[in-house]
């Protein structure tokens, strides 16, 4: 009886597999010092320290796998154990599981909530034991030291059998804290991840909180990606002076490697508190005017396949799309995706 009970208990314990054995989506380069980092290790002593540290956040990355398990469990260790007062810990350093449905859409399953630096959680249980394709989104504002996926000990976990999201010609995004995912409630609600699911296309997130300042080495990393579209959303972080000094150079680094790939510029959002804060309103107007001037200058020089998305309707007019007047809630992320997705869809269908 004790032997039988021991076997039953053992069968109830999940078997864990290192996530490094499964495909990782959302990286611009494989030349990183660790698997879940975003910039090549060669930039460690070249990039500004805050930019480099943010590149160690796993924003926009996702693991793809397949399993017939009745449950999915996770073990993970965060790199920094970050915490912020305007964003959920799930969004910062948690994980987010989706599965592919027969109707041709990715469906949210559940999130894994962190309790600290080292974590263990059962994401979902009591499922029917049938084969499912999964996508696991990684933390937006922290990095990972390790990640393991747990399944029933008698079940299988394998490589994905469908090539979704499509990895050919990914969409490469560059930008700020908002683009990195601030302040989505969970990783799957970052707008780059929403757009990826809607288009079923891999997206690469090169958002760096407070540091989307047109650092030219980032443009060089982007230029090495065989992208379908490049989206440049840096205006909230870049000063007018930085735009005048670096924007065209940043653009040309990418354009020289990709003469016909669409490159999209996006205006600064009309932040909700700009209705009241005159200084903020003036700065947003000034930055957007500068962006438009440089963009129009490029057009006059004969540059083709460049586009500008205006921000008037980006996050709505009701003032309800941010957590602090600046960083998007899930509502803001959805509204951004609603504006951007149809435009990008046209670009990748050309």
Where are these regions (language model features)?
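N-terminal secretory targeting modules
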Residues: 1-170, 348-349
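Glycine- and acidic-residue-enriched helix-capping/strand-helix junction motifs
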Residues: 84-87, 181-189, 281, 285
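Catalytic nucleophile-elbow at a beta strand-turn-alpha helix junction centered on a G-D-S/GDSL motif
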Residues: 168-192
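Active-site-proximal beta-strand/loop segments in catalytic clefts of secreted hydrolases
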Residues: 174-176, 206-209, 233-237, 266-269, ...
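Oxyanion-hole/transition-state-stabilizing segment in secreted/luminal serine hydrolases
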Residues: 183, 195, 212-249, 253-257, ...
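Short helix-loop-beta junction
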Residues: 192-205, 296
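Catalytic His-Asp segment of secreted/periplasmic serine-dependent ester chemistry enzymes
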Residues: 224, 271-350
């Amino acid at each position: 009886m004790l032997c039988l009970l021991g076997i039953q208990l053992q069968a109830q314990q999940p078997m864990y597999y290192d996530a490094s054995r499964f495909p990782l989506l959302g990286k611009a380069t494989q030349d990183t010092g660790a698997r879940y980092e975003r910039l090549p290790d060669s930039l460690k002593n070249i990039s500004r320290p805050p930019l480099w540290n943010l590149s160690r956040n796993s924003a926009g990355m996702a693991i793809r796998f397949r399993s017939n398990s009745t449950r999915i469990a996770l073990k993970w260790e965060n790199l920094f154990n970050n915490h912020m007062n305007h964003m959920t810990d799930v969004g910062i350093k948690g994980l987010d599981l989706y599965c592919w449905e027969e109707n041709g859409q990715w469906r949210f399953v559940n999130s894994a909530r962190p309790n600290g630096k080292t974590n263990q959680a059962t994401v979902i249980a009591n499922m029917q034991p049938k084969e499912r394709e999964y996508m696991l989104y990684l933390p937006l504002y922290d990095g990972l030291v390790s990640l393991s996926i747990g399944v029933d000990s008698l079940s299988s976990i394998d490589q994905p059998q469908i090539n979704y999201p499509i990895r050919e010609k990914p969409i490469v995004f560059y930008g700020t804290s908002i683009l990195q995912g601030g302040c989505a409630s969970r990783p799957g609600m970052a707008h780059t991840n929403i757009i990826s699911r809607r288009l079923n296309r891999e997206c690469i997130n090169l958002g760096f909180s407070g540091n989307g300042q047109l650092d030219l080495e980032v443009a060089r990393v982007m230029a090495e990606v065989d992208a379908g579209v490049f989206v440049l959303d840096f205006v909230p972080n870049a000063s007018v002076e930085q735009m005048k000094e670096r924007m065209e150079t940043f653009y040309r680094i990418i354009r020289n490697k990709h003469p016909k790939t669409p490159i999209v510029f996006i205006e600064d959002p009309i932040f909700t508190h700009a209705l009241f804060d005159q200084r903020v309103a003036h700065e947003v107007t000034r930055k957007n005017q500068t962006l438009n001037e440089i963009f129009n200058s490029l057009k006059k020089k004969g540059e083709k396949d460049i586009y500008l998305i205006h921000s008037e309707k980006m996050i709505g007019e009701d003032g309800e799309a941010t957590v602090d007047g600046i960083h998007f809630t899930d509502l803001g992320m959805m509204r951004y995706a609603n504006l951007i997705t149809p435009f990008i869809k046209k670009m990748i269908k050309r």
